[in-house]
A protein has these predicted regions:
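Helix-turn-helix DNA-binding segment
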Residues: 141-160
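N-terminal regulatory/sensing modules of transcriptional regulators
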Residues: 1-138
Length: 160
C-alpha cells in the first residue's frame, strides 16, 4: 500500500460527471489544492483503489435517490469496519437529505454536508472537516443536523 505522509489522498465517489468536474474545480482552489483527489463513479472502483492508495478521507456524494442513499450508508458502514482510519464524509443533495443521513447512518460519520450551500460555505465546511483528523462525530455540523429534528423511530428508519 502506498504510504505518503506529505500527501493526503481524498477519494470522492460521484456518479454524475458534471458534479465530478465541479468537485475537481473546488479542490483546485488554494484552500483545498494540497489534497490529491481521486474520483470514482462507484464504490467498487474505490474498493479496488484501496489496495494501492492510503486514503485519508472518503467523500461520498449523493443524489436524491433512495436506493443510492441506502447503498451509500451500507458501503460507508462497511468501510468503518474495515478501514476505520479513513474519514467518512457524505455530500447530501440538500439540507433535508443531510438531516436524514445524520439520522439514518448506521455508522459514525465524520461529517454530512449539503451540496445546496453556496460555494464559499461548501468550501469552508470541507476545509473544517478535512482539517479535523481525530474527531469523528464531534463537530458542529453533525451536532447542528442532529439537533434540528427529533430522532427517528425504528419504524420510520425502516420505511426510509
Amino acid at each position: 500500500m502506498e504510504k505518503t505522509d506529505s500527501t493526503r489522498h481524498i477519494a470522492i465517489i460521484e456518479n454524475c460527471s458534471m458534479s465530478a468536474v465541479g468537485l475537481q474545480h473546488l479542490f483546485a482552489m488554494p484552500t483545498l489544492n494540497h489534497y490529491q483527489l481521486h474520483l470514482f463513479s462507484g464504490f467498487e472502483g474505490f474498493k479496488k483503489a484501496l489496495h494501492q492508495t492510503n486514503f485519508f478521507s472518503l467523500i461520498y456524494s449523493l443524489s436524491d435517490a433512495r436506493e443510492e442513499r441506502r447503498n451509500c450508508l451500507a458501503h460507508v458502514r462497511d468501510l468503518a469496519f474495515t478501514h476505520s482510519h479513513i474519514q467518512r464524509i457524505i455530500l447530501a443533495s440538500d439540507e433535508m437529505e443531510a438531516r436524514l443521513i445524520s439520522h439514518l447512518s448506521p455508522s459514525r460519520l465524520h461529517g454530512v454536508v449539503s451540496k445546496s450551500l453556496t460555494l464559499e460555505h461548501l468550501q469552508k465546511e470541507l476545509v473544517v472537516l478535512l482539517g479535523e483528523t481525530l474527531r469523528i462525530n464531534d463537530n458542529m455540523l453533525n451536532h447542528w443536523y442532529r439537533s434540528q429534528n427529533r430522532m427517528l423511530s425504528p419504524t420510520e428508519r425502516a420505511i426510509l
